[in-house]
Regions:
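C-terminal ends of transmembrane helices
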Residues: 19-24, 94-106, 136-149, 197-204
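Helix-coil boundary and interhelical linker segments in multi-pass alpha-helical membrane proteins
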Residues: 1-6, 67-88, 119-127, 168-184
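Multi-pass membrane catalytic core of lipid/isoprenoid biosynthesis enzymes
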Residues: 45-71, 106, 135
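N-terminal signal-anchor transmembrane alpha helix
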Residues: 1-26
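Loop-to-transmembrane alpha-helix initiation sites
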Residues: 127-132, 149-160, 176-186
Length: 216
């Protein structure tokens, strides 16, 4: 039972907004600047690329390491009730980040933390999602001339769409009795990420994210 305390602890860790802390260090409240989102993209947009990358890796870490700890605990006690501890811990990390208790349940869009969770749960799916994210970002920026920061939204949505289907293709028996929780979890994470990016999708269709043409 003590091991299950990892779940609420992870929720509290996930609720720590590294984007807000980075903004605080620079004397800026990111909730009032840029996209007003407490995430790595907005941190990079408002504070600079270095801060954006720092927030990104910190958000990945708070999803990755608790899940790895949960997996170790579950594997050490295979006959106990800890079989679903990694998934519960993963859910706590993502929910904590997305609905942080420290900022009125207004958190980030869960992309970086979800990547960390995927790396800990299903690394093949993480690699496929990351590859699809990079490809779509490059197409958006290079071909459709989206601003670098604004190409992140479409890339994240596509990666989220790819996530559950990549799992179905790469995971043995994804609909097996013991594997159904993981499969359903990935579909729910994909839905959450897409819902969190609904404003990005709306802006894309309105063509408000188009970069200006180069000067003659």
């Amino acid at each position: 039972m003590i091991a299950w305390l990892l779940v609420p602890a992870t929720f509290l860790l996930g609720s720590i907004s590294f984007a807000w802390l980075a903004g605080k260090a620079k004397g800026v409240d990111l909730r009032e600047h840029g996209s007003r989102n407490l995430g790595a993209t907005n941190a990079g947009r408002v504070l600079g690329k270095g801060w954006g990358f720092a927030v990104f890796f910190a958000d990945v870490a708070k999803g990755l390491f608790p899940v790895l700890i949960a997996r170790v605990l579950a594997e050490q006690h295979p006959d106990s009730s800890l079989g679903q501890l990694p998934i519960a811990t993963a859910a706590a990390a993502i929910l904590g980040h997305s609905f942080t208790v420290f900022h009125g349940f207004r958190g980030g869009k869960a992309v970086a933390t979800a990547l960390g969770v995927l790396c800990g749960l299903v690394y093949k799916v993480a690699a496929i999602c990351l590859g699809s994210w990079i490809l779509v970002w490059a197409i958006g920026y290079g071909l459709f001339r989206l601003k670098p920061g604004n190409a992140v939204g479409p890339a994240s949505v596509v990666a989220a769409l790819v996530m559950p289907f990549a799992h179905l293709l790469t995971f043995p028996d994804p609909w097996g009795l013991l594997n159904i929780p993981l499969t359903l979890f990935l579909f729910l994470v994909a839905a959450l990420v897409i819902i969190k990016h609904r404003s990005n999708i709306a802006k894309l269709f309105q063509r408000q994210d188009q970069a200006p043409p180069p000067a003659a």
